[in-house]
Amino acid sequence: MRTNALRLKTASIFSVDTKHVGVLDGVRALGVLCVLWFHFWQQTWLMPMYATPFLSWAGVQRINPDVLRRVGYLCVDLMLLLSAFVLYLPYARRRFCGTQVDPVSTFFKKRFARIVPSYLFAVIVMYAVAMAQGAYKGKAVFALKDLLTHLTFTQMLFNDTYLFTGITAVMWTVCIEVALYLVFPLLANAFGRRPLLTYGVMVLFGVWFTICVSPAFGEPRIMVNRFLTFLPVFANGMMAAHLYVWYAERVRHKAIPSILGTIAAAASLYMIFRLFRSCAAAGDASHQQVWQMQNRMFLSLAFTVFLLGASISMKPVRKILDNKVLSAIAAVSYNLYLWHQWLIVKLCSALGAKSGADIANGGVSMQWTVTITGLTVAFAVAALITYGIEKPVSRLILNTGREN
């Protein structure tokens, strides 16, 4: 009896959880915060540097996160990669563990409950404010088109509603998510049967469309975020989930795999920094968009290695990402993403600022005041909508109790 109990205890210590990967909450939270930082920086031009006297022995006197704030939007790719990973995880468990996946109807019902209530609330409120402030004055046809396309997740089909919406620019990401949901059951089943073939087709088709087709159909700002350009990102996310569950069924959290995972996470983090710096050095927005199209596959590979490495890394390393603070941020991350840019823009506008230069001219204290106020309001709004609208409505749609 004691021997069996010891074996069960040992198995629980070294087993890998394939139902909930804790570090993903931390990665999601940090990804959203990077995007938030970029949009806040656009409005305030706040560029702090941090003194590091404790690193003086290594010749590092200060840390300047300029690269991160200038190209933090690249973490949108990370969040889409995470979506593919999480969505495919049950299918990977079916392949390697023999578990069941939800029927297609249940899959769509859960996706609807997850994103639509908060999204529709945001669209309606932001549109109403835009109308009240005269954003559509003299543009009645566009006003109707902007609303209808956003309500139907089709705004990216039209250049005007994608680039010049009166609602908020970040909504395009939800369109990409919805497009992924619509085809995901087909992709997941194909990936489950022929993972290497499906992965190769998704990557090659996505790269071909991005490099060969996109330049002929529009300028970079129009084509950079089309659904097909993200196929390699989705493929890498699905492959990451596939490899993670494969690992979980064959290897346990012992010393050597954990050390190798930690090394892989550190190395990939360095590569991500190098890629971010390369994008920042590309030039203005249009040149950075060209860089994105040319390097999206490489960046998503670096993100993939980081996800896998961090997920199987040593426990102290995993705890950096898998903790209550980042989990709390991850819980409200969807609404934080939907609202943060709109809120900081409205805050700066209320102060009479027309650009980041106006806030910067008010001095560093003004920049910090606006930033901290914006963060406070953004998190408060995100929490209120998450727990006041998203979760209650989701429970009604799914007919589940509070504990679920």
Where in the sequence are the language-model features?
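Membrane-interface helix-boundary signature
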Residues: 14-27, 65-72, 222-231, 253-260, ...
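Transmembrane-helix signature of polytopic, lipid-linked glycan biosynthesis machinery
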Residues: 159, 208-221, 270-277, 312
